[in-house]
């Protein structure tokens, strides 16, 4: 488990002032509850004033900053928390679930997300030359890092551009590049670095993850998957689990069940049709695995979700 288990010192006076300014910018650019694209490419801001049950999502690589409030994120059976003291980095696409904490209409969650293009990381590494990023054992593709002054300053300068839109085209790419550089230079930056290096084992695992994300409804043959990314079966299994906390088969199951739940909730599909759509041939197997994942069979789970909306 990776969470905020120990008491951390608060932000210093200057960082607290910057945090408050960041929260104000997000508040001005949201208005109502929801997540909003901005005039800056790949930058999203969000406001939420009510908590909810854990909601599933196929998260893409991103930097997530919390200006106000807290969010709990689950990867398999592990929990990660981030708040104004700590930011969250998703270094590789993976199925997550999350819920908001410390939230009320008077003090809504105010957050931003900056999507990360792995190709942009690769270009930055090539341009910057040796960054002195240490070689370390492969870790989760999701991590929490303490927010420091340079990172907060760069993020604040990026969001300030929302108030001066004429400056966005010239300055946003430069500040975005600075933010990515600071991520690479952070204590856990090796996790992004390893995935971005072509032909590294972590990069090959990320390619296997990408294939599963686009083909989860297909039968999974581990031998073929390993061969496709030029890894042995044992290496793929070991590194895949180290990165995602799941085996490839468990990962595929998560994707299938999350998508089936979405199909039933948003498109009104019956359980058997949703299960078939995501690759299940047996309705009874789908129902069993769905119940284990979400704590109730599909019909009861849908009734619970719809009543909470």
What residue spans do the PLM features occupy?
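N-terminal positioning helix adjacent to the helix-turn-helix/winged-helix DNA-binding module
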Residues: 147-150, 175, 197-208, 244, ...
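Basic/polar phosphate-binding segments, predominantly the helix-turn-helix DNA-binding elements
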Residues: 178, 182-188, 195-197, 213, ...
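Residue at a beta-strand N-cap/secondary-structure junction
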Residues: 79, 219, 268-269
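Short helix-to-turn junction characteristic of helix-turn-helix DNA-binding domains
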Residues: 212-215, 264
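Amphipathic alpha-helical segments enriched in hydrophobic/aromatic residues interleaved with Lys/Arg
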Residues: 4-18, 121-178, 182, 208-210
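Short, basic, alpha-helical segments at the C-terminal edge of helix-turn-helix-like DNA-binding modules
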Residues: 252-261, 300-309
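N-terminal regulatory/effector-sensing and dimerization cores
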Residues: 35-132
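A short, N-terminal "cap"/entry segment at the start of jelly-roll beta-barrel domains
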Residues: 1-39, 44-46, 52-53, 135-142
């Amino acid at each position: 488990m990776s969470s905020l288990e120990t008491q951390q010192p608060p932000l210093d006076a200057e960082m607290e002032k910057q945090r408050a300014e960041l929260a104000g910018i997000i508040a001005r650019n949201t208005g109502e509850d929801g997540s909003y694209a901005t005039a800056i490419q790949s930058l999203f801001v969000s406001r939420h004033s009510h908590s909810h049950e854990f909601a599933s999502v196929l998260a893409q690589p991103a930097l997530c900053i919390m200006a106000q409030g807290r969010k709990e994120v689950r990867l398999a059976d592990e929990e990660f928390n981030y708040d104004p003291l700590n930011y969250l980095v998703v270094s590789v696409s993976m199925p997550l679930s999350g819920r908001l904490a410390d939230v009320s209409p008077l003090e809504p969650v105010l957050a931003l997300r900056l999507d990360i293009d792995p190709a942009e990381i690769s270009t930055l590494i090539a341009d910057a030359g040796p960054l002195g990023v240490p070689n370390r054992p492969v870790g989760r593709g999701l991590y929490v890092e303490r927010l420091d002054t340079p990172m907060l300053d760069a993020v604040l300068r990026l969001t300030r551009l929302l108030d001066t839109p004429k400056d966005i085209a010239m300055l946003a790419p430069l500040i975005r590049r600075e933010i990515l550089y600071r991520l690479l230079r952070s204590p856990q930056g090796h996790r992004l670095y390893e995935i971005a290096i072509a032909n590294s084992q972590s990069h090959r695992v990320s390619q296997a993850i990408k294939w599963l994300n686009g083909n989860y409804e297909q039968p999974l043959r581990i031998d073929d998957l390993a061969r496709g990314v030029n890894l042995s079966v044992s290496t793929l299994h070991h590194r895949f689990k180290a990165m995602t906390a799941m085996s490839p088969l468990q990962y595929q199951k998560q994707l299938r069940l999350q998508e089936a739940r979405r199909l039933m909730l948003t498109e009104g599909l019956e359980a058997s049709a949703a299960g078939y759509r995501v690759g299940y041939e047996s309705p009874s197997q789908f129902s069993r695995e769905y119940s284990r994942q979400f704590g109730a069979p599909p019909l009861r789970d849908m009734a619970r979700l719809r009543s909470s909306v």
